Swiss-Prot record:
GO terms for molecular function: transaldolase activity. The active site is at 140 (schiff-base intermediate with substrate). It is an enzyme of class 2 (transferase). One of its GO terms (cellular component) is cytoplasm. GO terms for biological process: carbohydrate metabolic process; pentose-phosphate shunt. It is found in: Cytoplasm. This is Transaldolase. Belongs to the transaldolase family. Type 2 subfamily. Pathway: Carbohydrate degradation; pentose phosphate pathway; D-glyceraldehyde 3-phosphate and beta-D-fructose 6-phosphate from D-ribose 5-phosphate and D-xylulose 5-phosphate (non-oxidative stage): step 2/3.
Length: 368
């Protein structure tokens, strides 16, 4: 039977950890999670790095060296985060090799202040790719309107991409189109398509948080009964779209040339509502060929009491469509919800990035 996390892996879900810190790397904890908890990848974001630098003294030595060298705050942030990502990539390298490059992946985000700037996002992606210099790196690029052509351009250059901040089915389809366009351009340039990997990070819990807030405000019996179900419906229909696109003639031509599919990745899987089961966005989103990146608390919850019952996505498409229709019918505009979430998502990461810059600036000054 195996542990819940083993069962999840057996069902075709890659378990990734949504966290990184110098302390976790130095203590050997990441290696332990790989060995004991079926973890086969790591994601990071500005919020995670800001938290890591706020805790303990694991970064003091590097900060001291950077202060002596007189590097700028932005360059220091880039070097500190790249150091952790490179270390994590090396810890995960055996997984990368054992899975022929599918897993063993570590994701590093471009400066979120560039989310509405295509050209600078591509330049930043290129710079981070060169700086980290590991084949199992993925560069995180947001799925903003301006991010879409940046995704295509990065993939065309052979850079593996984790597309982040996807909330809507419409935008997810645009992301898959950007992915296919990038591979087509890479193929025209003579690149080996089998070395270019991508995941599409579809955010889950934030959808319920925003929709449920609006349903509670409407407060009718019908509206209240719809709470806690929209994120799953949205994600399940995203998987239906994935199945459709990756069975198309356009994709088949790329696959025959060695391309790997862009896997759906369930992100924001920590449950925010205490009335919902703390494993909800893992156990109810089991489908082959997906990734679920979990914060430590969610990983621990699934390991402790997660019940894996096989595929919980396919076979639920009609119910998912009916649910989203019902949400609209009681007065919640999903298009407004996802627009709000994208703006909030970018703003949240920008704020965390600025906190990270401030913290590093203070610590560099302390070591000067």
């Amino acid at each position: 039977m195996g542990s819940p996390l083993q069962q999840l892996s057996d069902a075709g879900v890659a378990v990734w950890l949504d966290d990184i810190s110098r302390q976790r790397l130095r203590s050997g904890n990441l290696a332990e999670l790989i060995a004991q908890r079926n973890v086969v990848g790591v994601t990071s974001n500005p919020t995670i790095f800001a938290k890591a630098l706020a805790e303990g003294d694991a970064y003091d030595g590097q900060l001291r060296d950077l202060a002596v060298r007189g590097v700028s705050v932005e360059e220091a942030v880039r070097l500190i985060t790249a150091y952790d990502i490179r270390w994590a990539a090396d810890v995960l390298r055996p997984v990368y090799e054992a899975t022929d490059g599918v897993d063993g992946r570590v994701s590093l985000e471009v400066d979120p202040r560039l989310a509405r700037d295509t050209e600078r996002t591509v330049a930043e992606a290129r710079a981070l790719w060169w700086l980290v210099d590991r084949p199992n790196l993925m560069i995180k690029i947001p799925a903003t309107v301006e991010g879409l052509p940046a995704i295509t351009a990065a993939l065309a250059e052979g850079i593996s991409v984790n597309v982040t901040l996807i909330f809507s089915l419409e935008r997810y389809r645009a992301v898959m189109d950007a992915f296919l366009a990038g591979l087509e351009q890479a193929q025209q340039a003579g690149r080996d398509l089998s070395t270019i990997h991508s995941v599409a990070s579809f955010f889950v819990s934030r959808v319920d948080t925003e929709v449920d807030k609006r349903l509670s405000k409407i407060a009718t019996e019908e509206a209240v009964a719809l709470r806690g179900k929209t994120a799953l419906a949205n994600a399940r229909l995203a998987y239906a779209a994935y199945e459709e696109v990756f069975s198309s003639a356009r994709w088949t031509a790329l696959a025959q040339a060695g391309a790997r599919p862009q896997r759906p990745l369930w992100a924001s899987t920590g449950v925010k509502d205490p009335e919902l089961p703390d494993t909800l966005y893992v156990t109810e989103l089991v489908a082959p060929g997906t990734v679920n990146t979990m914060p430590q608390a969610t990983l621990d919850a699934v390991a402790d009491h997660g019940t894996i019952t096989g595929d919980t996505v396919r076979g639920h498409y009609d119910a998912a469509r009916a649910h989203l229709d019902a949400v609209e019918s009681v007065g919640v505009s999903m298009s407004d919800v996802v627009e709000t979430l994208e703006d909030e998502g970018v703003d949240k990461f920008v704020k965390s990035w600025e906190e990270l810059l401030d913290r590093v600036a203070q610590q560099l000054a302390a070591h000067t």
